[in-house]
Amino acid sequence: DIDLISVMFNKKSLSHFQGPESLKNRRVAWIKGYDFHPYFDDSITVFEIANRKSLLRMLKKDRIDYYLDARVDMDFAKDEYHPNDESLIVRDLLSLKLYPAFSDTKKGKALTKIWDQRMGKIKDTKKMKDLFAQWGFEYPFP
């Protein structure tokens, strides 16, 4: 599966936006604790903000140029705080692969073993493929 990372910016910047390169030498913000650093070079000025409401306020007041977040969270925040605001533009920026993670404990290792065994049995079944199709997701296994 993937985590779709999107960027939000003010409409006045739309003509200048050319994807990830557009973030260079700009003020870019995301939720505190997220780690988008590995996907961008050091030319961006990063602001880590505690909540999405503040991120949107900063964007509206031109205190940041771009706001990065998971698409689903960004859409929710826009619908919650600025539902009819056409001055905020959202574009998809990155697709990050998702992997299950288990804690490095005895219980976590047991869960990892169960996950690996059961996924090995069900991943190529018709039932699994039907489940992905039912919810409109692309089947991720070759």
Mark where each language-model region is.
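Well-formed, non-transmembrane alpha-helical positions, independent of function
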Residues: S22, P38-Y39, R57-M58
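Short helices/loops that flank or line small-molecule/ion binding pockets
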Residues: K53-D73, E80-Y81
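Acidic, polar ligand-binding/catalytic clefts
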Residues: D1-L23, G33-F36, V90-L93
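Ligand-binding clefts/hinges and TM-proximal coupling segments of bilobed small-molecule sensing domains
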Residues: Y34-A50, E86, M119-P142
